[in-house]
């Protein structure tokens, strides 16, 4: 995708399932100027006295110019119009553990922030998902015998890795070097198979990267450690550590997580809480089939944050698969009443991440919201954002 000039701001959201697109053309100058707009199946061209902007669409994306409808000018945004569009299917989400390619391979666990090796050359013979929240209810409903695993923890063996919603459970008994917790040995008590174990809050169980001091996870027993998916990269040992911008990695992990949960459990609302049990964000998945294409032009009202160095900069173009979410921040007692309602709602799923990652995610969502055209930033009482896949 290339731009001849970057005078106009262009925003295009293509919905694959609906085969429709919302196109917003805005001029960077207050008050607007006369503009000639040309839409072809593979490009957009905006000609104004101030210059010309041409946006070529990615391969696989096609517009239907004859279907343009709903043309209107929205103050602060520019021209809005809708039209039919087609986009190639989004690549299927691939789990970190692709059983066909990584089975029986040695894997290395890295700290995503700095690349420090956490576990080297671990042969994972079994990668198993932990039972879902409704596992106990299903056993009681459908089985003629009591649940044999009730009130028992599920701990991985030496060459096992158990996967939760947003964490891994790994047995570190045989590792010569283990990431050590900050405090005393952990004590656990067991509730049910839905919550395979709970940590007593009085014990400090954080596992810290010895190089960058980032929290990677928590110890759950003398042999088992929980690593958060947002902090760890797992690769076949023969592959080199990839440098992935932090915000890009956090977005992709969380986006994949909520899409998989919504598909498996018909869950669309999530509370994002820290390891300190505080709720930081209320997240509502709106759709997961968006392709977002934008050229920011001279959009200069974007503050820069070090953690977001890879997010769109002025005079840049971007095309990405994304999930569209609604969110509400809950820090500093904001939205406390709504947060309490969600926490007590059985249809809302809770995701736990390190508290610093929750704050990073909130910053990412706020940044995404700030780059949207003003008319798209709010829906009802929620703020709107896109998480890149």
UniProtKB/Swiss-Prot annotation:
Transmembrane intervals:
none
Please list the GO biological process terms of this entry. proteasome-mediated ubiquitin-dependent protein catabolic process; protein autoubiquitination; protein monoubiquitination; protein polyubiquitination
Q: What is known of its domains?
A: The C-terminal half (AA 188-389) is able to bind cyclin-B and shows a self-ubiquitination activity (mono-, poly, or multi-ubiquitination) in a HECT-like sequence dependent manner.
Enumerate the InterPro entries for this protein: UBQ-conj_enz_E2-bd_prot
- Which EC number(s) does UniProt give? 2.3.2.26
Q: Which parts of the sequence bind Zn(2+)?
A: 144
- Region feature (Interaction with UBE2C): 235-257
Species of origin reads: Bos taurus (Bovine)
Query: Could you tell me what this protein is called?
Result: E3 ubiquitin-protein ligase E3D
Instruction: Give the residue ranges of motif BRAT1-like motif.
Output: 129-159
| Gene coding for it | UBE3D
């Amino acid at each position: 995708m290339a731009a001849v000039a970057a005078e106009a701001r262009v925003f295009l959201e293509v919905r694959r399932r609906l085969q429709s697109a919302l196109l917003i053309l805005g001029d960077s100058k207050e008050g607007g100027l006369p503009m000639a707009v040309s839409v072809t199946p593979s490009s957009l061209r905006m000609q104004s006295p101030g210059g010309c902007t041409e946006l070529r669409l990615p391969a696989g994306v096609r517009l239907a110019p004859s279907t343009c409808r709903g043309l209107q000018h929205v103050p602060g945004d520019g021209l809005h119009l809708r039209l039919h569009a087609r986009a190639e299917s989004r690549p299927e989400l691939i789990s970190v553990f692709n059983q066909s390619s990584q089975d029986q391979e040695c894997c290395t666990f890295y700290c995503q922030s700095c690349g420090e090796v956490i576990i080297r050359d671990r042969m994972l013979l079994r990668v198993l998902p932990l039972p879902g929240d409704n596992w106990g209810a299903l056993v009681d409903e459908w089985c003629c015998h009591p649940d044999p695993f009730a009130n028992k923890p599920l701990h991985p063996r030496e060459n096992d890795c158990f996967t939760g919603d947003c964490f891994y459970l790994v047995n570190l008994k045989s590792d010569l070097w283990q990431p050590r917790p900050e405090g005393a040995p952990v004590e656990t008590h067991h509730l049910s198979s839905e919550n395979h174990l709970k940590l007593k809050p009085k014990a400090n169980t954080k596992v810290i990267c010895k190089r960058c001091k980032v929290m990677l996870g928590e110890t759950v027993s003398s042999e088992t450690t929980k690593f958060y998916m947002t902090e760890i990269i797992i690769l076949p040992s023969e592959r080199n550590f990839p440098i992935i911008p932090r915000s890009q990695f956090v977005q992709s992990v969380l986006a994949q997580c909520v899409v998989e949960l919504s598909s498996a459990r018909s869950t669309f609302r999530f509370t994002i809480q820290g390891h300190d049990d505080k709720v930081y964000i209320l997240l509502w998945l709106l759709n997961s089939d968006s392709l977002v294409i934008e050229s920011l032009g001279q959009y200069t009202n974007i503050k820069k944050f070090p953690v977001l160095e890879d997010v769109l900069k002025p005079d840049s173009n971007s095309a990405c698969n994304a999930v569209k979410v609604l969110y509400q921040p809950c820090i500093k007692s904001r939205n406390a009443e709504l947060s309490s309602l969600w926490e007590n709602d059985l249809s809302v799923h809770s995701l736990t991440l390190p508290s610093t990652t929750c704050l990073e995610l909130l910053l990412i969502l706020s940044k995404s919201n700030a780059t949207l055209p003003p008319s798209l930033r709010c829906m009802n009482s929620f703020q709107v954002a896109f998480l890149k896949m």
